[in-house]
């Protein structure tokens, strides 16, 4: 009976299945969020974590393409440093339990935490509203792709030594570019809906809400 389900889909078939699952998860989480009361920021953070983990696992066949960096960047912008670090660390650990856990998980947690901190520090510049462009956010997301990858590259110091670190980083630039291109796509796709969701669940409801929350949570 089990063999009857063992269909050989090939790499593109599996990718299509994974993308379908990711969109189903995203739609279900969006519907769930619509039923939440306002200022449910902790629950929203949990839902974002589910989507980030799912996206990283399901998109793993595509090298260095995942929604995690953009999600954590935006969580830093809207929810502050502390919660973005919680999200960064949890996503790194939980997703790596499925795709491979090791010392690099610590560096990934550091890298994504730094992305969240960058979002919090520049929150007043990156906060989206109905009239603002997402171009500044896109530029920062590109920058964060390289920052994250280079932080994770530091993990090779435990095996290769400092003399080969620069060579290792240079060899990884094509993958860094893929990460940056992926971030451009995810900003274009996710920035507006995530901004709307996060703004709706901010704990402070006034024009400087984002700035005040970030200041209070650093």
Language model region names:
Residues 44, 73, 87-88, 92, ...:
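Alpha-helical transmembrane segments of multi-pass membrane proteins, especially transporters
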Residues 53-66, 89-123:
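Interfacial aromatic-anchored transmembrane helix boundaries in multi-pass membrane proteins
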Residues 37-45, 80-84, 137, 194:
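Membrane-interfacial loop-to-transmembrane alpha-helix junctions, especially the N-terminal start
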Residues 1-18, 105-107, 125-214, 218:
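Membrane-embedded alpha-helical hairpins and interfacial helices in multi-pass inner-membrane proteins
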Residues 68-84, 118:
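Generic transmembrane alpha-helix motif of multi-pass integral membrane proteins
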């Amino acid at each position: 009976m089990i063999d009857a389900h063992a269909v050989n889909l090939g790499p593109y078939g599996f990718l299509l299945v994974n993308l379908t699952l990711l969109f189903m998860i995203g739609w279900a989480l969006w519907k769930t969020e619509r039923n939440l009361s306002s200022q449910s920021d902790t629950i929203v953070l949990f839902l974002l974590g589910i989507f980030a983990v799912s996206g990283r696992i399901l998109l793993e066949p595509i090298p260095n393409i995942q929604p995690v960096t953009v999600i954590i960047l935006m969580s830093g912008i809207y929810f502050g440093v502390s919660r973005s670090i919680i999200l960064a660390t949890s996503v790194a650990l939980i997703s790596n339990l499925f795709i491979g856990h090791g010392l690099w998980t610590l560096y990934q947690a550091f890298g994504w935490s730094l992305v969240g901190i960058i979002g919090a520090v520049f929150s007043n510049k990156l906060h989206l509203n109905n009239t603002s462009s997402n171009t500044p956010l896109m530029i920062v997301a590109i920058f964060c792709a390289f920052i994250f990858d280079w932080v994770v590259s530091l993990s090779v110091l435990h095996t290769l030594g400092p003399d080969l670190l620069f060579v290792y980083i240079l060899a990884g630039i094509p993958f860094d570019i893929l990460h940056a291109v992926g971030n451009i796509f995810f900003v274009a796709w996710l920035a507006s809906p995530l901004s709307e969701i996060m703004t709706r669940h901010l704990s402070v409801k006034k024009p400087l809400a984002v700035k005040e929350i970030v200041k209070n949570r650093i």
